[in-house]
């Protein structure tokens, strides 16, 4: 009785080597990055492209499980960031709030602004407002993240808890900390934009192209 349980906890359903779990974890986090940059950022916030409904809903579903974020909140906060960039009203500017605050407390700044009903009401236009958004994704973000935890443990065993923790930390670290913080504080500039946005790296691979933040704020 005990041996099967120990065996399951040691490897889960997939029973992979540690390096295979590492590669899969990085792959899963990249799906999250792609979901944020293509769906939330380019499609929803800036209306730069239209996605097939099936593709758009896959991104919504994945983000519900991998981040617990609500589309209208992310979009509204990002639009306000562009509208009020580097001012005291910017939700996450290191120019007004300090680089240490944005880098280490970026997720807290996001959650605080998500509770600002005026921000959401003013900047949420055009975001999904269907039944599943109102009754599932918007109301039960914790259920999505809990579902991801269960899936990770089933697939990877006890190591799935670590996989899940990395997934949950990925956007707070890369987006809230690195892009919103470092991307307005340190790096190089291809263009003289009216804000402090910088390019962190010329290769937009790790964070889905968001590393080229000066380019984005200019165009």
Predicted regions and their residues:
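Non-catalytic, topology-defining segments of multipass membrane proteins
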Residues: 1-178, 182
């Amino acid at each position: 009785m005990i041996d099967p349980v120990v065996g399951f906890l040691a490897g889960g359903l997939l029973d992979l080597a540690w390096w295979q779990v590492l590669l899969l974890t990085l792959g899963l986090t990249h799906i999250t990055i792609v979901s944020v940059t293509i769906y939330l950022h380019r499609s929803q916030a800036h209306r730069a492209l239209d996605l097939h409904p099936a593709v758009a809903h896959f991104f919504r579903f994945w983000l519900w499980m991998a981040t617990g974020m609500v589309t209208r909140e992310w979009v509204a906060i990002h639009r306000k960031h562009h509208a009020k960039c580097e001012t005291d009203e910017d939700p996450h500017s290191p120019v007004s709030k300090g680089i240490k605050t944005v880098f280490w407390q970026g997720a807290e700044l996001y959650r605080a602004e998500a509770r600002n009903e005026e921000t959401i009401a003013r900047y949420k236009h055009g975001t999904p407002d269907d039944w599943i958004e109102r009754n599932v994704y918007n109301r039960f973000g914790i259920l999505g993240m809990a579902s991801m935890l269960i899936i990770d443990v089933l697939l990877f065993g006890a190591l799935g808890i670590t996989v899940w923790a990395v997934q949950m930390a990925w956007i707070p670290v890369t987006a809230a900390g690195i892009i919103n913080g470092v991307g307005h504080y340190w790096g190089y500039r291809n263009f003289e934009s009216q804000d402090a946005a910088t390019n962190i790296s010329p290769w937009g691979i790790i964070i889905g192209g968001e590393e080229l933040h000066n380019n984005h704020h200019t165009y």
